């Protein structure tokens, strides 16, 4: 499954529990090199980018996405 498809599946199929899901990305500015982004922060996704709901209009390239996890049981939904 492609990243875009996994993100859209969670956004639409599990929208009632959207806060239970996170995207883990590579972030060079953090100490451990990873950053969790809640699905509630995602505004849109296309073939190349995740678009976040923010004043800065943050755009994250999909090649930085490492995995998608469900927080409640730490289940791995998608992994590169």
Swiss-Prot record:
Pfam families: MJ1316. It comes from Saccharolobus islandicus (strain M.14.25 / Kamchatka #1). Belongs to the UPF0248 family. The lineage of its organism: Archaea, Thermoproteota, Thermoprotei, Sulfolobales, Sulfolobaceae. InterPro entries: MJ1316, UPF0248. This is UPF0248 protein M1425_2629.
């Amino acid at each position: 499954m492609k990243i875009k498809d996994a993100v859209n599946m969670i956004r639409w199929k599990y929208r009632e529990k959207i806060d239970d899901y996170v995207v883990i990305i590579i972030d060079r500015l953090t100490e451990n090199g990873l950053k969790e982004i809640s699905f509630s922060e995602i505004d849109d996704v296309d073939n190349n980018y995740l678009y976040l709901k923010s004043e800065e209009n943050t755009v994250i390239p999909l090649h930085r996405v490492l995995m998608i996890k469900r927080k409640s049981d730490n289940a791995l939904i998608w992994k590169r």
